Amino acid sequence: VYIQSYKQYVDDLKCFMDKIVTRRSTSDNYILFAHSMGGAIGAMFLEMYPQYFKRAVLSSPLMKMKFKNLPYGIIYVVIKLAVLFGLEKEYAPGQYAFDGINIFEKSSSMSRKRYNYMFEARKCHRSFQTYGGTYAWTKASVMATRYIIRHAKNVKIPVLLCQAGCDSLVDSKGQNIFSKKSQNTTLKRFTYSKHEIFNATGSI
């Protein structure tokens, strides 16, 4: 995945809302549902354009990246240097292209049926095969999460933030800070869920 700024994603969403949704809808009672990276894009959109949605559900939103046990500051310096030296379109460490291998056991899903459904769709459609992040995407993601926390107070609509207790991709600290800084956010923690809450077990 390559992007220079999450503003590009936000602009795309605004274009979609303006040219498709609002023109074809018979109601203006829009509810936003967004997951993970989409949750970051959704949060930024709510901060920049608060007039579009009446309420929102953010599922495991990316509001702080998780870099295992490595210091956040050092990681960011390495990423900036990689971009500076022209490696922005190279995969960041640990990232790779879609290889068509089923890795349910290592995935962020807890439902094999739901995982397999998405996996087969991804295998069949090349446009679904976005996978590993580049250095540029990682840098853009860090910048986006900082922006989201800084402007959280601009989100005034009711937001349900669903937090996964066993998330290996997203650091929940960012979600906690956002929930406190935004004006009307309810945080619901799913203690035993992995990152993809909607792909968890039926009991969750």
Model-derived features with residue positions:
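Short alpha-helix in the alpha/beta-hydrolase fold that links the catalytic acid
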Residues: 157, 170-180
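Alpha/beta-hydrolase fold nucleophile elbow
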Residues: 24-36
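Catalytic histidine-centered segment of alpha/beta-hydrolase-like enzymes
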Residues: 193-204
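Conserved alpha/beta-hydrolase "nucleophile elbow" surrounding the catalytic nucleophile
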Residues: 34-39, 164
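Alpha/beta-hydrolase-fold enzymes
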Residues: 41-129
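Active-site nucleophile elbow and catalytic-triad environment of alpha/beta-hydrolase enzymes
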Residues: 132-152
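Short beta-strand/loop motif that positions the catalytic acidic residue
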Residues: 155, 161-163, 167
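Alpha/beta-hydrolase active-site loop
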Residues: 2-21
